[in-house]
Amino acid sequence: VGKPSRYNEMLLKAMNVQPNETVLDIGCGPGTFVIPLAQQCHAVYALDYSQGMLNMVQQYKEKHQLNNITLLHKSWSDNWDDVPQADVILASRSTLVDDLDDMIEKLQSKAKKRVFLTSVTQRHFLDEGVFEAIGRDDVGFPTYIYLVNRLYQKGIHANVSFIETESGHFQ
């Protein structure tokens, strides 16, 4: 789905999903990872808060004749009692949440084996000169280190690695 990217290739390789495994892709968007994962594993649960994104996943699902994809219309703040557990959890670029502790609890309750999270390493997605040009403060987002520190405080020793994107930034 979409154009090939180094980020996508590196993340899929790192995940090393096996044919007998299930995957929960949280914040799946249009199916960037859902489709290639469904082609290599037992089942994929595609979770997104946007019905429009899930509609796109449905279109790709039909186009590629993949019957092992289940769509879940949820957000991080919803009740996840009916979200199935999966061997592998992926939350790619979808970890900027209001309640980090709730997110971590949901990940822990749904993951059977492994969790892959990606987060920004830069405080924002725009060039710093943009903020100066428009006369606004460069406030930005919390970076990956906030997430790593919170995991550590909860006794989770995350294995952290970086993927350089086409823009030269790391994720």
Where are these regions (language model features)?
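Conserved class I S-adenosyl-L-methionine
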Residues: V1-N16, N20-G29
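Class I SAM-dependent methyltransferase SAM/SAH-binding core
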Residues: T32-N67, H73-S77
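Short conserved loop adjoining the S-adenosyl-L-methionine
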Residues: D78-V83
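A short SAM/SAH-binding and catalytic strip from SAM-dependent methyltransferases
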Residues: D87-D101
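Short, conserved SAM-binding segment of the class I
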Residues: D102-K106, K110
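Conserved beta-strand signature within the Rossmann-like core of class I S-adenosyl-L-methionine
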Residues: K112-R123
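Substrate-binding/catalytic lobe of Class I Rossmann-like enzymes that use SAM or dcSAM, i.e.
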Residues: V139-Q171
